[in-house]
Amino acid sequence: MMISRGLFGWSPPHMQPLTPVSEVSEPPESPSPYLDPGAESGGGTGTAAALAEADEEMDDQDELEPPPAAVPFSQLFACADRFDWVLMIVGSVAAAAHGTALIVYLHYFAKIVDVLAFSNDSSQQRSEHQFDRLVQLSLTIVYIAGGVFISGWIEVSCWILTGERQTAVIRSKYVQVLLNQDMSFFDTYGNNGDIVSQVLSDVLLIQSALSEKVGNYIHNMATFISGLVIGFVNCWEIALITLATGPFIVAAGGISNIFLHRLAENIQDAYAEAAGIAEQAISYIRTLYAFTNETLAKYSYATSLQATLRYGILISLVQGLGLGFTYGLAICSCALQLWIGRFFVHNGRANGGEIIAALFAVILSGLGLNQAATNFYSFDQGRIAAYRLFEMITRSSSVANQEGAVLASVQGNIEFRNVYFSYLSRPEIPILSGFYLTVPAKKAVALVGRNGSGKSSIIPLMERFYDPTLGEVLLDGENIKNLKLEWLRSQIGLVTQEPALLSLSIRENIAYGRDATLDQIEEAAKNAHAHTFISSLEKGYETQVGRAGLAMTEEQKIKLSIARAVLLNPTILLLDEVTGGLDFEAERIVQEALDLLMLGRSTIIIARRLSLIKNADYIAVMEEGQLVEMGTHDELINLGGLYAELLKCEEATKLPRRMPVRNYKESAVFEVERDSSAGCGVQEPSSPKMIKSPSLQRGSGVFRPQELCFDTEESPKAHSPASEKTGEDGMSLDCADKEPTIKRQDSFEMRLPHLPKVDVQCPQQKSNGSEPESPVSPLLTSDPKNERSHSQTFSRPLSSPDDTKANGKASKDAQHKESPSFWRLAQLSFPEWLYAVLGSLGAAIFGSFNPLLAYVIALVVTEYYKSKGGHLREEVDKWCLIIACMGIVTVVANFLQHFYFGIMGEKMTERVRRMMFSAMLRNEVGWFDDEENSPDTLSMRLANDATFVRAAFSNRLSIFIQDSFAVIVALLIGLLLGWRLALVALATLPILTLSAIAQKLWLAGFSKGIQEMHRKASLVLEDAVRNIYTVVAFCAGNKVMELYRMQLQRILRQSYLHGMAIGFAFGFSQFLLFACNALLLWCTALSVNRGYMKLSTAITEYMVFSFATFALVEPFGLAPYILKRRKSLISVFEIVDRVPTIEPDDNSALKPPNVYGSIELKNVDFCYPTRPEILVLSNFSLKISGGQTVAVVGVSGSGKSTIISLVERYYDPVAGQVLLDGRDLKLYNLRWLRSHMGLVQQEPIIFSTTIRENIIYARHNASEAEMKEAARIANAHHFISSLPHGYDTHIGMRGVELTPGQKQRIAIARVVLKNAPIILIDEASSSIESESSRVVQEALDTLIMGNKTTILIAHRAAMMRHVDNIVVLNGGRIVEEGTHDSLAAKNGLYVRLMQPHFGKGLRQHRLI
């Protein structure tokens, strides 16, 4: 049995099937000679050429890439303490003992064969003596089994435990140093989770290298050394010859190993393109549906999968040939040694047992060396990872100063004196150049300027996130470099537009690591107008927030951030565009809290909207890193300089004059060559920049520039508006009607994870508190990925939330009850039935050879004992020739098995992926709103679940056929030779099977618990890194470390149980293997002793069952794998079989030739599928005539964007109808319907491709002239033409970065090119700054000109200058409707919403 595991049961380590390869390799849809079985028979030229080409590419890559830096192996254990060294020494001794046990068994196996051979003596006394000897040997094997149990247990337990202990120290040190780094580190390496993923992956590599891999290496080296010793002790000549053939076997495996690992890396890269296409399509599903590009996405995905064909086929080819030659050479080597062995038997220099022991001891020794060598890859990876981590651990911060001075009292006088500054990640770009600024104590100074003026860099310098390149930053006359860093930051309160919340309670987030009583925290919350909404929560201040808890609206986050600053009671206050992402009502509430906070404090305000800082004590105007103007609002207006220009530009976006614009549909040569910066002090890009040094005008207290120009440079730390806009407690996310997104630097947008609901009582129901109440009353809610709308909870809910959840859960449970049948899986692979037949033939042949080889070897050994002279030579020569022929056939059988089953699996994986992706794109938008169907989750399903289908069928079918034939042939041989011993072997089968299954299930269960703990620990770190600026500003690093160490301690406590459990399971399973072999031996001895079988029969049957034992167990050992992947299999067919609630492909639906554009929402009730308890629209009715432009305004969460979602038919109403030209939308073909609508979203979706492809995404057959005309109409042609590659410029990942305004103009050009009769605009300019907003507004004005039906969602007055009607929403109902003048006369909600645009004289203004 042990022999079979070493030679024919285990795959050599370098030839183990590469799971990652199968997970990414994708055969193409189109025919290929690689997939044609007949193509291979035509010659090997194509294959050889492909291999040669692949090898050449890999060599080129190796030449270009220098070897990575690594630490010495001994340094991996730098964090080990005395207890760790004890664990490693004990574990090493146990590993060596465990590795030696198999070879020791072989030594006794030789004795068993000798005893069996001599037990044929007729002497009764000698026969009894031999029987007693066999019983003793059986007991010896039992003792070996006990030793294996103990040593295996100790080996695994010690190495797992010490690995967890040492890596816990490494993690702790890494995180400690990471949190103390200056911000330039995060600018260089990113702070979006990459650092966290690096530490997680690197620590796992180090843990593997210094724990179980070391134990495995010692184990296998012990097998190697002891194998040589036993081999040479038994028969040194046979051992030496066997050793001489080893390099050929190793070479066969080594060559294939090189190709396999290189091809595995290449195929991962090849699949990355397909994965990117799928992720984009799913992430931007609304845009994809709006432009009806499902077919394009499916075609692109299927085409990109073709790239993996070459590598997938090569992998199957290399795997088949590599395994074939490795096994073939091993079998041929065995034939050679047995043939040579007859000479030593004939000469009396060795007996059969010694030859067998020497032969297999050396073979197992060689395999042990191979397995030991495979650990070097893990050692190298661990050393490389350790270099990266240890380099970080020894890195010192350039701004750390814990030994600096502490001022006795702080007045709050701040001065920037001749400051020069550049970000370390972009040293060639000057941000500040000779900057001077003085902030008097207890005064508020607002910094304004264009993008790239450097204003956003002032706060990081004040917080000492960075140090100036030249110059000084002074606090009360003292250079802040000389001050103790932690003390300095404790004097500064920071409130940002994007406040950070750790995954803690609200109480802990407000305290943020400081010792504060609950009364103090509540008082701070009251001052921040946050106490009321916190108290309304079920758990109040103990409510968990952050990624692992309750989701907060942006307004609520800002209030908590203000409360945090209030509790700090700082002398200096830094406000970084705090209200930039809020709507006007929410802005008013937050501004009141900020006004209280600013009293008596030195304050620096970074502002984008100039209307908010008119009351500041001083306003500092910046341009190109210098201070060019400074004074009060009135002084700067009178000056007529840059501030006046910026204010004029901002006001132009509020009350723009109507510009005569021709209908572009009437003129094919319409030109829009207007200056995009007109009226804003922005020069034409083609104009030369004339920059003169600003001069200080004495006497007026004002800086005046001699000449100004536009600086297009942006600071690395962009402070973009938050993606969520919030109102007061009675209001909610402005993007509650929309899809919450996180903007990334690669121009992609990633949907936020699922956000649970926040229920807050309506203002009418609130108790009296310090917070002002909102005049509106929708509930605060937040929703995950879809266009959420938030409304108050109506008294007539459609269904009970509990009932809904219960029903949903029951439905899912019902779906999970039934697993896909074997025949369902077989149907997927039916097109590859020929490959399956050829692969099955190879698997059957190779599986049968396992017991047949044991049978023939047993016959040779028998001849050693019973034959003499010429008869011995003839018999041994005959059987050795048969063994050699079996070796040759093994090469062919392995090639057939692995090559053709590999092709079958690759095509099956590709087909399943295409089916899944196609099925995903059939589903309605509501399906994607479910947290289980997030873009990341669905992308992972495409990448992994399809390979699980392959693994559950193709790969496992191959093994099952192989092992089944081994079992069948072994049982047939056993039953024919002696049924008694066969029954004993069958009786041990359930024991071995249950042992294997229990071991795998046990290990999986404990590993899952440890992995979950590591995941929770990583969340703590990831939260801190993502919010590193806030963590550092509030000196919360110690709090983060405390939380992280608590998680590590939990992991260590669990690892003790984890290591002991795994060690016990492993050792016990090994014990059963040896013990069952001992039982089989005892029964063999008993059968021979009592005359039930002859000598030759006993030796033959014992060896057959010994060789076949592993094959008997392995098919049953697959059960845990199948059970583990059951959910993945079900997931595949759940997606494929799902029937969408909104059918997109109903060819019988209406496709009328003309669209007049009349839209009506009639008595509509609507709630989002994931939030059925929240009624967003209630009995809602709205009628829009064809060609009419209607603006929809309202507070956050009133249901504005939901209207667009219903018109696009992303969702169907719960009650009522949505009509187009008098017909229900449900009657129209869905793709036809969407093809007649043009959608412009607040956050423009820009795909990672060229500008050209982004524009023609709307119409792929558009000509060059049509595309450029659309860009001109969208005011995009000018900036596109100025780019080096023009329309072929690649944007997004690995391309240029565009401003939000430029992205929006490209998105508008896309809609212009579509030329749809219905235009839907969803707050398209709300997140764009004033400079770009006017240019975008002009493009939108042009877009809606002509006979088009337009629905306009807006909260800016500039968006409503061309509208025919204005509809005001609140709580899912229309509360006001009419023109601007009529609504202004009512002095209602519309007036309150628009008042920040016009001031108190709103009713006197008219929109012309």
From Swiss-Prot:
Its annotated function is as follows: Probable auxin efflux transporter that contributes, together with ABCB6 and in a FKBP42/TWD1-dependent manner, to the regulation of leaf position and morphology, internode distribution, roots development, and inflorescence organization, probably by modulating auxin repartition.
* Reaction(s) this enzyme catalyzes, per UniProt: (indol-3-yl)acetate(in) + ATP + H2O = (indol-3-yl)acetate(out) + ADP + phosphate + H(+)
The protein's location, in the record's own words, is: Membrane
Q: Which Pfam families does this entry report, sorted A to Z?
A: ABC_membrane, ABC_tran
Q: What is this protein called?
A: ABC transporter B family member 20
User: What are the ABC transmembrane type-1 domain coordinates in residue numbering?
Assistant: 88-381, 836-1124
Task: Output the Gene Ontology terms for molecular function.
Answer: ABC-type transporter activity; ATP binding; ATP hydrolysis activity
Chain residues that bind ATP 2: G1194, V1195, S1196, G1197, S1198, G1199, K1200, S1201
Disrupted-gene phenotype: The abcb6 abcb20 double mutant exhibits compact rosettes that twist laterally and bow, showing increased leaf down curling and wrinkling, along with twisted inflorescence stems, twisted siliques, lateral organ separation defects, reduced internode lengths, and fewer secondary inflorescences. In abcb6 abcb20 double mutant, roots are short and twisted. All torsion phenotypes are associated with reduced auxin levels and reversed by auxin efflux inhibition with 1-naphthylphthalamic acid (NPA).
Q: According to its UniProt record, in which tissues is this protein expressed?
A: Expressed in aerial tissues.
Report residues binding ATP 1.
G449, R450, N451, G452, S453, G454, K455, S456
In which domain of life is the source organism classified? Eukaryota
Q: InterPro entries under this entry? A: AAA+_ATPase, ABC1_TM_dom, ABC1_TM_sf, ABC_transporter-like_ATP-bd, P-loop_NTPase, Type_1_exporter
**UniProt keyword terms in alphabetical order:** ATP-binding, Glycoprotein, Membrane, Nucleotide-binding, Repeat, Transmembrane, Transmembrane helix, Transport
Residue span of region Disordered? 14-49, 676-735, 752-816
- SMART domains (UniProt xref): AAA (SM00382)
